[in-house]
Amino acid sequence: MPDSRPDTELSNPQSTKPPLDPHLKALENESIHIFREVAAEFERPVMLYSIGKDSSVLLHLARKAFYPGRVPFPLLHVNTGWKFAEMITFRDEIVKRYDLDLIEHINPRGKAENITPFTHGSARYTDIMKTEALRQALDAGQFDAAFGGARRDEEASRAKERIYSFRTPDHRWDPRNQRPELWNVYNGQIRKGESVRVFPLSNWTEVDIWRYIQAEDIPIVPLYFAEKRPVVERDGMMIMAADPRLELLPGEVKREEVIRFRTLGCFPLTGAIRSTATTLEDVIAELEIATVSERQGRAIDRDQSGSMEKKKREGYF
């Protein structure tokens, strides 16, 4: 599948490109089938685009599903204003390269009240700038289906979520009120006002994602690769200290470390890991011996016991 606009700035570090093995091909086929089912069943689908590795794979699969046509639905980026600068640069280049329709939404209430992760804490910040903002954007666009890049291996509440995740008119998720999914048969019938979150990557693992990125040569944000970067130790995490809005607390010292990120979100709430992985092969080798979840680097998952399920019940991604 050729790029509509070649761009050398969006290339990963040089890597071997192995053929797509049968396991990855089966996952790819399943995901493409889901994209086509949703496009046929629903009137106004949208794809949630958070710019990370899973979103990059999701977008690649969407492009494959409808090639040689354009992706037939818009991308929605819920922008908190606190993303890594590299993520926004990457997003804009991707949109240009693939001729995509992008909707960017920032919660006007959060912006007016100057809600930040520093002043209001991660729980309230996430609720207003992510969950509430997402509900606003979905309502404004009258979208009845929203693709997301969540995987079942990431976290406990996501492990029990179906591929078609039904939401009430106020976007709430009730795990006890979901439909059975038999093989590849999905029931997309909804009542007026209801919607569905759709997760084509449900059955993928983190290593699957990286192997697919390698095999398909999918560009990703450079922050996933190790490099010397400024960091500060805070709340048990290494926070990247490249943004001038990050003010050092008493006793904190900025230093340089060779780091990378396993997961990307808002920079004040995303912890880096020490790593020497500068290529896709290095990243995959590192993950194959990893003993902790990628979500360990997300501060929002530490808010309280069961916090991710609580957020999802309220309408989170």
UniProtKB/Swiss-Prot annotation:
Pathway stated in the Swiss-Prot or TrEMBL entry: Sulfur metabolism; hydrogen sulfide biosynthesis; sulfite from sulfate: step 1/3
Any one GO BP annotation for this protein: sulfate assimilation
Which EC class is this protein assigned? transferase
Question: Which Pfam family would be a valid example here?
Answer: PAPS_reduct
Which key words are in the record?
A: ATP-binding, Nucleotide-binding, Nucleotidyltransferase, Transferase
Q: Which GO terms describe its molecular function?
A: ATP binding; sulfate adenylyltransferase (ATP) activity
The reply on keyword Nucleotidyltransferase is yes
- The record's region (Disordered) falls at 1-22, 298-317
What reaction gets catalysed by this protein? sulfate + ATP + H(+) = adenosine 5'-phosphosulfate + diphosphate
**Which E.C. number(s) belong to this protein?**
2.7.7.4
The answer to whether the entry has keyword Nucleotidyltransferase is yes
Superkingdom in the source lineage: Bacteria
The record's subunit annotation is: Heterodimer composed of CysD, the smaller subunit, and CysN.
Summarizing the function annotation, the protein's role is: With CysN forms the ATP sulfurylase (ATPS) that catalyzes the adenylation of sulfate producing adenosine 5'-phosphosulfate (APS) and diphosphate, the first enzymatic step in sulfur assimilation pathway. APS synthesis involves the formation of a high-energy phosphoric-sulfuric acid anhydride bond driven by GTP hydrolysis by CysN coupled to ATP hydrolysis by CysD.
Provide the family line.
Belongs to the PAPS reductase family. CysD subfamily.
What's the protein here called? Answer: Sulfate adenylyltransferase subunit 2
Please name the source species. Rhizobium tropici
Q: Which gene encodes it?
A: cysD
